[in-house]
């Protein structure tokens, strides 16, 4: 093994690199715009997104339990149209229904139902086993209340256009499939329109659980849910901001993906600000990213900060109250992130085979000694980047390109006061997700006790 030693005089190096170091590889082959990804982002069409939104509205309802046999109305007509759109985009897209038979249960599944997710797979060329999922739910809901004010969940055929929730996400996934399917990527891209979200994340839960059982390697899940409005019910507007929700804790796979979305999204769509929200979702709400997080995959939700709650789950969630221009901006962020990940090398492994972090205090006992593994490095791998931040900082604060090393030592830096990670970069500057060094949870201890021994004379 080779080693680079960087002497850091104080932790202020996170903000001011005044320490003495061995020179890293130069120039740094990352942090720049790829012309191919730039073309992909530019190809996203607001007009096509608007056309998709109008078509989805014309189905009148996409309720999961609506009539699946009607040719122009309801969930069946909608999923057939989505299926055919995927097929039209490219012969390289492998399009299928992911079908489940779900029993009547709970409040919202008022009868047995055949549930169909619509899936389009664009196989990767070099690492086809590694998957990037771009998804949204295509079902809709309009709530009807009875005379007593309680929700009548049996009303499955009422007008429920669902343009913002979630025709907007569905239109984005369709447009992303159209554009990205014209290119080749090292990893596999999977475009999914989920059903049953409004009944409790049913379609995504069943898909994520199946993926885990099958041992699928899902590197990232970008869930788009409610990305179609840029004016809130109180008149507030932030049409150049998108929220990205991610799962705790601070260095979870989900949180690393959120940081990646911010970094790459703002690089390729500089007119937008990606605002990371460190919660799994909004209060009282849920999304199709959550089942993937439950299965240990990195998943995030992209959503508008400007939702009009008066239109939520109602007959007024129409195209007239939507903003295709805002949806297009969020779709471009998706395009940049998905393409960059699909072209990037795989993340390095920073744990042992038993899951222990490959981090220590070095020979001095007062250093940060980082190690990582890559069993099969890509032929175009340029090297690795060590990233670090204060434990209280929301995002990475310093990066050091170390080249084709598999360990790195920072003298005088406490591993207890700084969070570290490593990412891989290729010669074209494509960056992997960061693999963070995480302290494994300390197991809860239990101790047996007994009654005090009896002593004579007491």
What are these regions (language model features)?
Residues 307-354:
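His/Asp/Glu-rich mid-to-C-terminal helical/loop segments that flank catalytic regions of hydrolases
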Residues 366-380:
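Conserved aromatic anchor
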Residues 25, 48-123, 273-275:
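A non-catalytic alpha/beta surface segment that caps or lines the substrate-entry region
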Residues 398-405:
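Short beta-strand segments within Ig-like beta-sandwich modules, predominantly Fibronectin type-III
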Residues 194-291, 295-301:
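Metal-dependent peptidase/peptidase-like ectodomains
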Residues 120, 134-135, 139-140, 145-200, ...:
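Alpha-helical metal-binding/catalytic segments enriched in His/Glu/Asp
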Residues 427-458:
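Extracellular fibronectin type III
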Residues 410-431:
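Beta-strand-rich modules
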């Amino acid at each position: 093994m080779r080693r680079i030693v960087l002497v850091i005089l104080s932790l202020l190096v996170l903000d001011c690199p005044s320490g003495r170091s061995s020179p890293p590889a130069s120039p740094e082959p990352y942090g720049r715009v790829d012309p191919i990804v730039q073309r992909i982002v530019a190809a996203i069409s607001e007009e096509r997104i608007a056309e998709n939104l109008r078509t989805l509205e014309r189905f009148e309802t996409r309720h999961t339990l609506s009539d699946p046999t009607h040719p122009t109305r309801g969930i069946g007509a909608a999923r057939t149209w989505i299926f055919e759109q995927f097929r039209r985009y490219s012969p390289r897209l492998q399009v299928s229904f992911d079908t489940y038979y779900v029993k009547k249960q709970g409040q919202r599944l008022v009868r047995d139902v055949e549930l169909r997710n619509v899936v389009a797979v664009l196989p990767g060329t070099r690492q086809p086993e590694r998957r990037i999922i771009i998804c949204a739910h295509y079902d809709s809901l309009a709530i009807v209340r009875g005379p007593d004010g309680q929700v009548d969940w049996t009303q499955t055929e009422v007008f429920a256009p669902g343009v913002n929730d979630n025709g907007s996400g569905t239109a984005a996934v369709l447009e992303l499939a159209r554009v990205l399917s014209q290119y080749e990527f090292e990893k596999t891209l999977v475009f999914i329109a989920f059903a049953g979200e409004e009944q409790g994340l049913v379609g995504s839960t069943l898909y994520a659980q199946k993926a885990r059982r099958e041992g699928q390697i899902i590197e990232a899940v970008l869930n788009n849910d409610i990305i179609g409005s840029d004016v809130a019910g109180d008149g507030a507007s932030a049409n150049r901001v998108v929220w990205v929700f991610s799962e705790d804790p601070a260095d979870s796979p989900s949180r690393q993906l959120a940081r990646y979305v911010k970094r790459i999204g703002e690089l390729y769509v500089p007119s937008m600000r990606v605002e990371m929200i460190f919660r799994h979702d909004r209060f009282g709400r849920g999304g199709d990213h959550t089942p993937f997080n439950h299965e240990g995959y990195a998943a995030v939700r992209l959503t508008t900060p400007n939702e009009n709650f008066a239109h939520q789950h109602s007959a007024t969630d129409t195209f007239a109250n939507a903003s295709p221009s805002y949806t297009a901006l969020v779709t471009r962020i998706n395009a940049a992130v998905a393409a960059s990940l699909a072209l990037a090398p795989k993340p390095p492994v920073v744990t042992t085979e038993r899951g222990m972090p490959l981090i220590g205090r070095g020979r001095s006992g007062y250093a940060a000694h980082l190690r990582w593994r890559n069993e099969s490095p890509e032929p175009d791998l340029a090297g690795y980047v060590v990233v670090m931040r204060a434990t209280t900082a929301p995002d990475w604060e310093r990066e050091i390109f170390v080249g084709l090393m598999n360990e790195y030592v920072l003298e005088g830096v406490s591993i207890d006061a700084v969070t570290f990670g490593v990412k891989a970069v290729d010669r074209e500057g494509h960056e992997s997700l960061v693999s963070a060094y995480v302290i494994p949870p300390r197991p809860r201890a239990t101790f047996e006790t007994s009654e005090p021994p009896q002593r004579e004379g007491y």
